[in-house]
């Protein structure tokens, strides 16, 4: 089980007027949580309760979910438990609405919505664990006959795999990520803004880039027709880090340069 007790919430939430009106609820008490669980018929995971005590639902700045299976989903907000808020577990557009009215499968609890406007939703999936166990987090796609895609083994891991989108992340936020996280962010986002992505890397300083990041930037140069600059980056990578992808990308850059 992955909890959020020591999670850094700085910059996670987008506290706009819309968020306060439709998502963000009052501070929660243990009694509120027990009442919500009784109404829903499920024990809520510890990590979700920790989120509620930090922020009772809301719109997220870190809205891009990426996991190790290369699934990429863009989140709008995470539901709280204040029934007076439209987008909450017990609200007008809450769990009962999506399952009873929109006919999403009754596999658990709708915990977050996406930028699709209701055409795919994020669920706590209790099918394997039962109503008192630790649910997985899945995406249910209405447009694909309510197909179910696993996203994370638990809610804590789901939250920890939310990233800022390329368009919104600051240089400081990007540089605070590990190299693995940087590459994951750059590789998996749909419709990536190459100009901003390259800027994020070059602002670190070419001489400060690891072989992994040099390769990522070189690939972007290849994709934007900057073959000579790509070759220069690939040549900076030492022999020990030249795997099959290095030879492929470097060869591609040389072929592109010869064809100019």
What are these regions (language model features)?
Residues 1-118, 176, 182-185, 189-195, ...:
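A surface-exposed partner-binding patch
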Residues 182, 217, 250-252:
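Structural register within alpha-helical repeat arrays
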Residues 190, 256-260:
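Short coil/turn linking the two alpha-helices of tandem helical-hairpin repeats
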Residues 202-208, 236-241:
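Solenoid-like repeat scaffolds
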Residues 221, 254-256:
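Residue at a conserved register position within TPR or TPR-like alpha-solenoid repeats
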């Amino acid at each position: 089980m992955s909890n959020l007790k020591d999670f850094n919430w700085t910059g996670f939430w987008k506290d706009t007027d819309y968020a306060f009106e439709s998502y963000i609820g009052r501070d929660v008490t243990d009694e509120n949580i027990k009442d919500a669980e009784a109404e829903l018929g499920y024990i809520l995971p510890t990590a979700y309760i920790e989120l509620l005590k930090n922020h009772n639902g809301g719109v997220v700045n870190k809205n891009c979910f990426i996991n190790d299976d290369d699934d990429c989903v863009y989140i709008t907000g995470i539901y709280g438990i204040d029934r007076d808020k439209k987008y909450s577990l017990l609200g007008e557009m809450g769990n009962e609405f999506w399952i009873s009215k929109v006919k999403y499968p009754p596999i658990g609890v709708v915990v977050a919505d996406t930028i699709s406007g209701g055409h795919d939703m994020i669920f706590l999936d209790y099918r394997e664990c039962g109503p008192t166990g630790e649910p997985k987090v899945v995406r249910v796609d209405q447009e694909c006959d309510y197909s179910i895609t696993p996203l994370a083994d638990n809610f804590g891991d789901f939250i920890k795999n939310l990233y800022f989108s390329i368009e919104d992340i600051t240089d400081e936020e990007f540089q605070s990520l590990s190299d693995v996280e940087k590459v994951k962010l750059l590789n998996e986002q749909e419709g990536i803004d190459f100009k901003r992505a390259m800027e994020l890397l070059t602002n670190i300083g070419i001489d400060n880039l690891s072989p992994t990041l040099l390769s990522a930037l070189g690939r972007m140069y290849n994709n934007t027709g900057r073959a000579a600059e790509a070759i220069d980056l690939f040549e900076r990578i030492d022999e020990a880090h030249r795997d099959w992808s290095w030879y492929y990308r470097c060869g591609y850059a040389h072929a592109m340069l010869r064809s100019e």
